């Protein structure tokens, strides 16, 4: 194979190198049992990688505790860009009478990911294999009750408010009539605004940029009009009868069995799933990541380094207090250490000068004493005692001293 510059340009090499790197993207999906979380995950990933918890339940669901289930799926778009999609599922969410423990587990997990990044940033020598586990999007599934948010919905969303990009969706939207769905969306939006819940609003982040694309603005206005997204998941996949392996054809054949009648869930007229998937994995993926790092994490980091006591969450969700000094920037610590060492060296150097000066003064004093003793016919013996000397010895010593 010829690898000359005529066949392989530097731009092509850079593109190949870029395509080899996967984009790390993390989504947490929250919903009560039976809300269709597993179905949504399987539809999002294009396969049955998740077994619904309801199908494996053998005990009273109210005795089960919340667990965080992690799934990783490698996806690739038409241009060859790879996405390492990390999905955190939440089986048994809100199964207990008191849901505070469930809220705490999820909030602790989200905060822990921030703490891990904060600790990594504070290290002088960073880990090149460090994996960023921050949650970029939290999809909250709302049951299709025909009403607004439930008390559990409100309390949980208030717990995670300002900690993550929240996207509310109505699950199993096909159980509502178009009129009921429209009313349900209006009531949910009203509750979100009344309770001060900051759900994700499309394009607010982009408006801060110098360049504004009118087409993008219109598209984002359209997306905002769909919130909360109405989703219908798929529990069965059928191959294309024409034998085509084209992904677009396969997508159109995803169906949901409802009263034994198949529903094409990729039809945007009755289902927002295709739009939601495109938002998550194509059009707004980088925006979710940027907001998570530049806005949400920076606010958390500022609070953590502001001098206030806060809670560091370890992997076991046990908490321990950490003060500001534990998060001092390493550069500041190094400067303080260098200053301390410099002062210590100066003190040692000055002590040596003083000792040398004292020794010289003592030596001169001894010489003067010795001269006076010799003049009087005396001297120091080996024990340091003063004794008389013979006259000739005294003369010789006087000559030596002179």
Curated annotation (Swiss-Prot):
Q: Which GO terms describe its cellular component?
A: ascospore wall; cell division site; cellular bud neck; cellular bud neck septin ring; cellular bud neck septin structure; cytoplasmic microtubule; cytosol; Gin4 complex
> In the record, what terms sit under GO molecular function?
GTP binding; GTPase activity; identical protein binding; molecular adaptor activity; phosphatidylinositol-4-phosphate binding; phosphatidylinositol-5-phosphate binding; structural constituent of cytoskeleton
State the SUPFAM superfamilies in the record: P-loop containing nucleoside triphosphate hydrolases (SSF52540)
Question: Null phenotype?
Answer: Causes greater curvature of cells growing in a filamentous manner and morphological defects in suspensor cells and chlamydospores. Leads to reduced tissue penetration and non-invasive fungal masses in mice infected kidneys. Also leads to hypersusceptibility to caspofungin.
Q: What is its main location?
A: other
In which family does this protein belong, per the annotation?
Answer: Belongs to the TRAFAC class TrmE-Era-EngA-EngB-Septin-like GTPase superfamily. Septin GTPase family.
The UniProt entry, under PROSITE patterns, shows: G_SEPTIN (PS51719)
Identify the stretch(es) annotated as G4 motif: 171-174
Q: Where is this region: G3 motif?
A: 89-92
Q: What is this protein called?
A: Septin CDC11
């Amino acid at each position: 194979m010829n690898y000359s510059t005529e066949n392989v340009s530097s731009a092509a090499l850079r593109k190949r190198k870029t395509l080899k790197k996967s984009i790390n993207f993390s989504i947490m999906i929250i919903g009560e049992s039976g809300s269709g979380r597993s179905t949504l995950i399987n539809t999002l990933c294009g396969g049955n990688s998740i077994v619904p918890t309801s199908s494996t339940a053998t005990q009273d669901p109210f005795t089960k505790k919340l667990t965080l289930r992690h799934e990783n799926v490698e996806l690739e778009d038409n241009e060859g860009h790879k996405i390492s999609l990390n999905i955190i599922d939440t089986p048994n969410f809100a199964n207990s009478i008191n849901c505070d423990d469930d809220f705490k587990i999820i909030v602790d997990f989200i905060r822990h990911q921030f703490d891990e990044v904060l600790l990594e940033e504070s290290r002088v020598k960073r880990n090149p294999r460090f994996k960023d586990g921050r949650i970029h999007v939290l999809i909250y599934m709302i049951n299709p009750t025909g009403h607004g948010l439930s008390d559990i919905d409100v309390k949980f969303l208030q717990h995670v408010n300002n900690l993550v990009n929240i996207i509310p969706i109505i699950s199993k939207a096909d159980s509502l009539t178009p009129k009921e769905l429209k009313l349900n969306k209006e009531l949910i939006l009203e509750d979100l605004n009344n309770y001060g819940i900051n759900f994700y609003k499309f394009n607010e982040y982009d408006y801060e940029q110098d360049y504004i694309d009118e087409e993008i603005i219109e598209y984002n206005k359209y997306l905002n009009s769909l919130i909360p997204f109405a989703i219908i998941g798929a529990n069965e996949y059928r191959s294309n009868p024409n034998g085509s392996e084209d992904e677009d054809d396969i997508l159109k054949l995803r169906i949901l069995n409802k009263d034994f009648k198949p529903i094409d869930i990729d039809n945007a007229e009755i289902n927002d799933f295709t739009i939601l998937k495109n938002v998550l994995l194509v059009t707004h993926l980088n925006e979710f990541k940027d907001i998570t790092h530049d806005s949400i994490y920076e606010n958390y980091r500022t609070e953590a380094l502001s001098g206030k006591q806060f809670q560091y969450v370890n992997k076991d969700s046990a908490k321990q207090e950490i003060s500001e000094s534990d998060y001092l920037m390493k550069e500041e610590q190094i400067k303080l250490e260098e200053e301390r060492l410099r002062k210590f060296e100066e003190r040692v150097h000055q002590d040596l000068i003083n000792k040398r000066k004292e020794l010289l003064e003592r030596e001169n004093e001894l010489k003067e004493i010795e001269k006076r003793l010799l003049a009087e016919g005396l001297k120091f013996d080996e024990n340091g005692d003063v004794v008389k000397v013979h006259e000739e010895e005294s003369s010789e010593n006087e000559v030596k001293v002179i």
